[in-house]
Regions:
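Non-catalytic cap/lid and distal C-terminal segments of serine-dependent acyl enzymes
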Residues: 1-140
Length: 140
């Protein structure tokens, strides 16, 4: 792994995909790219999807909320594709809404709607996401 930010790649699904986006958007100088698969990217309240009370207050949660971070940092993500959003299992609506928001904000991103897969690390999505993070897969 490179020490520079472009060598620090984030990959996750479900809440860890949400976390990958949140990390990159909060620390764009530290991380290069983030890929999320079947993630609740538009989660707008603390405690949803099993996140419990880890954020504490609603004000604290606001500092991690992906939709707010996209809006606040759009200008920093318009030139180079650093956000990757692929496939779905149970969060297709969240992906569609995140994609629409990124389009509206003119954020450069890779979006693939599908294929639908089981909400699991072993359902076959990791290879495609890793290839996209590494720039090894052409857009189909």
């Amino acid at each position: 792994m490179k020490a520079a930010s472009e060598g620090r790649l984030l990959l996750g699904f479900s809440k860890s995909g949400w976390g990958a986006y949140s990390l990159l958007l909060r620390h764009p100088d530290l991380f290069g790219k983030a890929a999320a698969w079947d993630a609740p990217l538009m989660m707008d309240k603390s405690g949803r999807y099993g996140s419990g009370d880890i954020f504490g207050t609603d004000d604290n949660f606001a500092g991690y909320r992906v939709s707010k971070l996209l809006e606040d940092n759009a200008a920093n993500f318009q030139k180079e594709t650093r956000l990757i959003l692929t496939g779905y299992g149970g969060f297709r609506d969240e992906h569609e809404r995140a994609h629409e928001l990124m389009e509206k904000l003119k954020i450069a991103h890779e979006y693939r709607d599908g294929p639908a897969r089981k909400h699991d690390w072993h359902s076959g999505w990791v290879k495609e996401a890793a290839e996209l993070l590494l720039g090894r897969k052409d857009k189909e």
